[in-house]
Swiss-Prot record:
Disulfide bonds: none annotated. The lineage of its organism: Bacteria, Pseudomonadati, Pseudomonadota, Alphaproteobacteria, Hyphomicrobiales. Residues 291-541 form the Glutamine amidotransferase type-1 domain. Keywords: ATP-binding, Glutamine amidotransferase, Ligase, Magnesium, Metal-binding, Nucleotide-binding, Pyrimidine biosynthesis. Pathway: Pyrimidine metabolism; CTP biosynthesis via de novo pathway; CTP from UDP: step 2/2. Its EC number is 6.3.4.2. The active site is at C380, H514, E516. CTP binds at S13, D146, I147, E148, K186, T187, K188, P189, T190, Q191, K222. Residues 1-265 are annotated as: Amidoligase domain. It catalyses: UTP + L-glutamine + ATP + H2O = CTP + L-glutamate + ADP + phosphate + 2 H(+); L-glutamine + H2O = L-glutamate + NH4(+); UTP + NH4(+) + ATP = CTP + ADP + phosphate + 2 H(+). Allosterically activated by GTP, when glutamine is the substrate; GTP has no effect on the reaction when ammonia is the substrate. The allosteric effector GTP functions by stabilizing the protein conformation that binds the tetrahedral intermediate(s) formed during glutamine hydrolysis. Inhibited by the product CTP, via allosteric rather than competitive inhibition. One of its GO terms (molecular function) is CTP synthase activity. It comes from Rhizobium meliloti (strain 1021) (Ensifer meliloti). This is CTP synthase. Transmembrane segments: none annotated.
Length: 542
């Protein structure tokens, strides 16, 4: 029978509920338990697929094609368990499901209301499909007091009564700010946050308190007294150098022991933390440093590239080097020479994106990398722009462009109208909806023998996650290959180009998929490990 841990947040947003949930999941896994993590998002969008990356951050794509919150990326990276579309739900999805049921007549003429219909839908989502798990950790997005989160708070309150006694625990993540003028940490924001949570009928069992310095014992006693929580369950969550130190830090503070104690479970056996300790040691004691330039268009919010950043760090962990990131807005290269920005870097990465803005800058970055022999990694849009660059400057197709930017006589990159998923043919049109209509999720690809990328993977058959609606036009394949660009990976039916490379370049690879989504600190993705290794070689030449 599954036990449930509900994680709420208070005082301010962005305290790290996702990291806390993921770290707790990793600690319970390290004790041998089977863990599932789920995210409840209060916004009205059906999913984050059409939300601006500069507002919401990255859209994390699962194997089964769901566009989800970036916290699911943390869940996967910390636990190694692949998330599914049933691990993330939004208010928009819930209301859509309810309205569809009402239109079908499923409610038999009843007046559809927030209680019980919305709350029941939330409870069903939380509790369904958990037969194979020992613990289900549910993170509730937003902050206690947000009007959007009220139905979720009510639902998890009800679950405290609906579930068998002793199978639901509430963890409240809060902030204890330091006031320089007073020279002390303040408990009042946490007291008010807990009071607001209690007013909703939820009484936290554990307080996880973020702070930038040690919390004195007297302040812990005060929180215990005023928040009605055992003193041992007031857990300090101090700032750490790397998010991969968090599982070790939380175990040291006793979070996993307190969670088990709240369920009446003896905290044995001790968690096996050797792998996490090795990762932490590699991060603390690098044997070198490389600088990677990320030429993107959403650089104003680094969370737009969250999985990408972590995957690069994973490559650094694999090679025992520190990875330093240089962020460059791609529009800069439309007006200025890339050389002054890129001459001293050891690798260039052009990530995914949508739309024409900044595209010429990405093309110029790809040209610089090709001509100067600097390691280049093009992901999704970054691969497409590398192909456009080759078409223009190697194949002499001066008007080469993408139909994403408007009509063109040389559509080197075009809209996909149909593709094979499993045994079924999927079709799309330019007039269709934007949401959920891309080529999403895991697809297989066949790699060409004796290519660099086949050597990196060590296998000719791979599966990677996609999120795109435009694709390199296979009709240009022969013209481009005659100029030295190798199409090193194709879809199994040979219709969709998946990877490209230059055999005469130290490391120039483009991929149509998003390998960063499958990288883990305990299991770095081979492409990122190889890219950082190539950057390390480049650092010895610069």
């Amino acid at each position: 029978m599954a036990r449930y841990v509900f994680i709420t947040g208070g005082v301010v947003s962005s305290l790290g509920k996702g990291i806390a949930a993921a770290a707790l999941g990793a600690l319970l896994q390290a004790r041998g338990y089977r863990v599932r993590l789920r995210k409840l998002d209060p916004y009205l969008n059906v999913d984050p697929g059409t939300m601006s990356p500069t507002q919401h951050g990255e859209v994390f794509v699962t194997d089964d094609g769901a566009e989800t919150d970036l916290d699911l990326g943390h869940y996967e990276r910390f636990t190694g368990r692949s998330a599914t579309k049933t691990d993330n739900i939004t208010t928009g999805r819930i209301y859509k499901n309810i309205i569809d049921k009402e239109r079908r007549g499923d409610y038999l003429g009843a007046t559809v209301q927030v209680i019980p219909h919305v709350t029941n839908e939330i409870k069903n989502f939380v509790t369904e499909g958990n037969e194979d798990y020992d613990f289900v950790i549910c993170e509730i997005g937003g902050t206690v007091g947000d009007i959007e989160a009220m139905p979720f708070m009510e639902a998890i309150r009800q679950l405290g009564n609906d579930l068998p006694r002793g199978t639901a625990v509430y963890v409240h993540l809060t902030l204890m700010p330091y006031i320089p003028a007073a020279g002390e940490l303040k408990t009042k924001p946490t007291q008010h946050s807990v009071k607001e949570l209690q007013a909703l009928g939820i009484h936290p069992d554990i307080l996880l308190v973020r702070a930038d310095r040690e919390i004195p014992e007297a302040e812990r006693r005060k929180l215990s007294l005023f928040c009605n929580v055992r003193q041992s369950a007031v857990i300090q969550a101090l700032d750490v150098a790397s998010i991969y130190d968090v599982p070790i830090a939380y175990h040291k503070e006793g979070l996993d022991n307190e969670v088990l104690a709240a369920f009446g479970i003896e905290p044995a056996p001790k968690p096996r933390m050797e792998a996490w300790e090795d990762v932490a040691h590699r991060i603390r004691t690098p044997e070198g440093e490389v600088t990677i330039a990320i030429v993107g268009k959403y650089t104003g919010l680094k969370d737009a590239y969250k999985s990408l950043i972590e995957a690069l760090y994973h490559g650094g962990i694999a090679n025992r080097v520190k990875v330093k990131l240089e962020w460059i807005e791609s529009e800069v290269f439309e007006k200025e020479d890339p050389a002054p920005y890129l001459e001293k870097v050891h690798g260039i990465l052009v990530p995914g994106g949508f739309g024409e803005r900044g595209s010429e800058g990405k093309i110029n970055a790809a040209r610089f990398a090709r001509e100067r022999k600097v390691p280049y990694f093009g992901i999704c849009f970054g691969m497409q722009m590398a192909v456009v660059e080759a078409a223009r400057n190697l194949a002499g197709i001066e008007k080469a462009s993408s139909t994403e930017f408007g009509p063109t006589k040389e559509p080197v990159v075009g809209l996909m109208t149909e593709w094979v998923k499993g045994n079924e043919l999927e079709k799309r049109s330019a007039a269709g909806d934007l949401g959920g209509t891309m080529r999403l999720g895991a697809y297989r690809a066949a790699l060409k023998p004796d290519t660099k990328i086949a050597g990196i993977y060590g296998s000719p058959d791979i599966s990677e996650r996609h999120r795109h609606r435009y694709e390199v036009n296979v009709d240009y394949k022969s013209r481009l290959e005659s100029c030295g660009l190798v199409f090193s990976g194709m879809s199994p039916d040979g219709v969709l180009p998946e990877t490209i490379e230059y055999p005469d370049h130290p490391w120039f690879i483009g991929v149509q998929y998003h390998p960063e989504l499958k990288s883990r600190p305990l299991d770095p993705h081979p492409l990122f490990s190889s890219f950082i290794e190539a950057a390390l070689e480049q650092s010895r030449l610069v």
